[in-house]
């Protein structure tokens, strides 16, 4: 019995009893009398003494039992109170956790929606950029075509101008010939007028000579009539004289009559012969004078007629030449007018084309500026969204780490694949290393743990291109396979790049290719120069197309292209860096996460998709 009491007195308290034991509820007990005093003062037997000792021990045991029972009752009361408090706290924590979870899920849904909208906007922007790039290339091709047509039109204009100048020279020559012919015509007209006057004078002289001839003929006729009349008178006088003489002679001696008749006949014959001779002489003189005058008049008339015919022929030929020259001049003037009209039309068309091309270029530049502004704005918005998303992903990662820590502390082992958990943890660690995180305090709240059921990994290769230039010459485009490098002069002045070098490096210290431009190479405003590798089938057409003799551009995933001036200073560069974007998708009963990691040392992104599923599993935080 004594050993039992001793074992009961040394019993340990129940687990969880951390408070100090209170004194028993009974009143203070008197100290037990010592054995020596009892032995000395009471003459009791050893049996009674043992009974008293047992009684005292039982009293002590009863007191300790009462104290223990009271303590147990107090602990039960405290336990019930603490149970109520724990239940109240648990309900409060559950309610707060549910509210925070709902708010967080709403924010996640909103963020997911914003990310989806951003992805759609980015895809739409990329499609629009590609479409606008194609439209820009098409407009550039049209602009090149129009420029070629404009160059052809300018060549035609120059050709037409040269032809117009030739026609103007011919026209001036024709005008000079026309003036000369007009002068010749005026001289011919003057000569014709003089000949006309001479002809008039000749005709007047002819008329006068004709009148003189008529007068002479009339005079001759009058003389003939007068001669005839005189002959008649003479005959009558002779007859009268003969009659008188016969009358007289009839009265004279018949002897002298025959002699006198013979003498008279002889005298009459002589007189008649003399008159006839004189008349013949006069007739011959008049006839000779008349014939000479007529011959002179005929010769003068013939000369006048010949000169008149010659003048008329010359006038006719001159008129024919003048008409032909006038017709030629009219044709040349018409052709010149047509050419001038054509030149004006071509100049107007050229001006319209230049104005239209200028307007198209202005519109394209405005559109490019607007697209650049939109791209800048979208990139800024995308960067803001990415910052927000990264912050949310970091919050999610911190929350997940807290859950993992609580599960590890409480020895809760989720049923998951080890490789998937390691990959997911590695992604979380990479995200924590790569991105500056905002520390989330570890609050002692209840959280739901994610039980991963399945996961999936994807990797996509992408290239990042960045370019910069100090001057007007920039590296516009490079071929990933190393076929060509294209330079572009974005300024409005011609740039001489003779002696400049174009280098292409692999990983800064790897193999490289260097091409040095000829000293006479120049880039026109808005001009493009393409440097081709030697193994391509491009044609060497300087200065726009240059083919290297024996070199070819190096190609790799990470390349850097540099343009050096004659002093060795870098004036333009273009970097092309390969990025591997890995996607990790894991689904669980509570959540579905997707992590996207860009393995180029720049960024690591995490996305969470899907609605969290409800679970009855809880984590008790003491």
From Swiss-Prot:
Residue positions, PTM N-acetylserine: 2
Result of knocking out the encoding gene: RNAi-mediated knockdown in spermatocytes results in spindle envelope disintegration, failure to form contractile rings and central spindle microtubules during meiosis I resulting in abnormal cytokinesis and multinuclear cell formation.
Gene Ontology biological process terms in this record: central nervous system development; chitin-based cuticle development; compound eye morphogenesis; digestive tract morphogenesis; gonad morphogenesis; heterochromatin formation; heterochromatin organization; male meiosis cytokinesis
PROSITE patterns: IF_ROD_2, LTD
Region (Coil 2): 266-408
Keywords: Acetylation, Coiled coil, Cytoplasm, Cytoskeleton, Intermediate filament, Lipoprotein, Membrane, Methylation, Nucleus, Phosphoprotein, Prenylation
Region of interest: Head: 2-56
Lipidation sites (S-farnesyl cysteine): 619
Predominant place of localization: nucleus
Motif Nuclear localization signal per record, residues: 446-451
Family from the record: Belongs to the intermediate filament family.
SMART domains per the UniProt record, alphabetical: Filament
Disordered: annotated span: 1-50, 429-448, 603-622
Site location (Heptad change of phase): 289, 353
IF rod domain: residues covered: 54-410
InterPro entries membership: IF_rod_dom (IPR039008), Lamin_tail_dom (IPR001322), Lamin_tail_dom_sf (IPR036415)
Name of the protein in its database record: Lamin Dm0
